[in-house]
From Swiss-Prot:
Substrate binds at residues 11, 34, 61-70, 117, 179, 189, 209-210. Transmembrane segments: none annotated. The keyword Lyase applies. This is Orotidine 5'-phosphate decarboxylase. The gene is pyrF. One of its GO terms (biological process) is 'de novo' pyrimidine nucleobase biosynthetic process. It comes from the Bacteria.
């Protein structure tokens, strides 16, 4: 099995913070990074071009959710930036997800966000008025994403096994909310797992933010998580 790299969440507000963070890493260490709303809205497409110029892969995490035509045209624009992965909200429906696939083309990986890892059972039922268990809701969205031709979903590692059962083993599961075993910091994430646990249940990608970006030695923290992530063969 090929060695996998954890995706580093670049949860910064500007380019200066990003460049300072990346200085902790050797230039030959090619990374897979996540650019979210805050950084993208602050710096725009130039941040994509900068990161790509360094040779890193990019997961552009904007979670598009709009009418199909708007999502299609937006994805067409994003495709020109050379991103490697992006996403939409599964709640937008099958037609919107199909439109996203059409706009993005077949190059980048396209994922659907199911339920955020910050969402609890109670919040989902009260705020979203979904009277299912979290895992049933996630699996429902995963099946709809597969129907729409997407490559996979973003979901908690706790739901990965069931997602693979309901779709297939090749359907990608990207899992945020990953925390090393020695950390007690849960922040706003409610459904979390360690890198090793995520690999055991079958996650294909993991996203790690603060345990790396806030570490005293970010590069060593990254290597430790990468080693744990690849421990299960």
């Amino acid at each position: 099995m090929l060695e996998k790299c954890p995706i580093i969440a670049l949860d910064f507000s500007d380019l200066a913070s990003v460049t300072t963070f990346l200085e902790h890493f050797p230039k030959e260490e090619l990374l897979f990074v996540k650019i979210g709303m805050e950084l993208y809205y602050s710096e725009g497409p130039s941040i994509i071009r900068y990161i790509k110029s360094l040779g890193h892969r990019i997961f552009l995490d904007l979670k598009l959710h709009d009418i199909p035509n708007t999502v299609r045209s937006s994805m067409s624009v994003l495709a020109k930036l050379g991103i490697d992965m992006t996403n939409v909200h599964a709640a937008g429906g099958v037609e919107m997800m199909k439109a996203a696939r059409e706009g993005l083309g077949e190059g980048p990986i396209l994922l659907a966000v199911t339920q955020l890892t910050s969402t609890s059972q109670e919040q989902m039922q009260v705020d979203q008025h979904i009277n299912l268990s979290v895992v049933d809701s996630v699996c429902h969205y995963a099946q709809k994403a597969q129907e729409a031709g997407l490559d996979g979903v973003v979901a908690s590692a706790q739901e990965v096994k069931q997602i693979k059962k309901q779709t297939n083993e090749h359907f990608i599961c990207l899992t945020p909310g990953i925390r090393p075993p020695q950390t007690n910091q849960l922040d706003d994430q409610k459904r979390t797992m360690t890198p090793e646990q995520a690999r055991i249940v079958g996650a294909d990608y993991i996203v790690v933010g603060r345990p790396i970006t806030k570490a005293e030695n970010p590069y060593q923290a990254y290597l430790d998580i990468k080693e744990e992530w690849n421990r299960i063969k």
